Amino acid sequence: MTTTKTMLVAFVLTLFFVISSVHCSDGTSGYGITEATKRCFTPAPCTRGLFYCQTFCSSLSAVLIGVCESGICCCILNQ
């Protein structure tokens, strides 16, 4: 009886250890579901020129690139 309880406890602890050590990826293959790669703002940053639009986008995040499209500043995710 004692051996059975010991084996059961050892099995459960081993199972918990194995489950906790498994690393799962939350990424998806292909394009998948990702955050928006482009966000456009009011034309105010582009009225000062492309450099100001780029500065505006990089101030939001270091991975964004600013582009003026039809006078509207769009921040694009740098991939």
From Swiss-Prot:
Residues 1-24 form the signal peptide. It is found in: Secreted. Its main location: secreted. This is Defensin-like protein 117. The keyword Cell inner membrane does not apply. It comes from the Eukaryota. GO terms for biological process: defense response to fungus; killing of cells of another organism. The keyword Flavoprotein does not apply. Belongs to the DEFL family. Disulfide bonds join C40-C75, C46-C68, C53-C73, C57-C74. One of its GO terms (cellular component) is extracellular region. Keywords: Antimicrobial, Disulfide bond, Fungicide, Plant defense, Secreted, Signal. It comes from Arabidopsis thaliana (Mouse-ear cress).
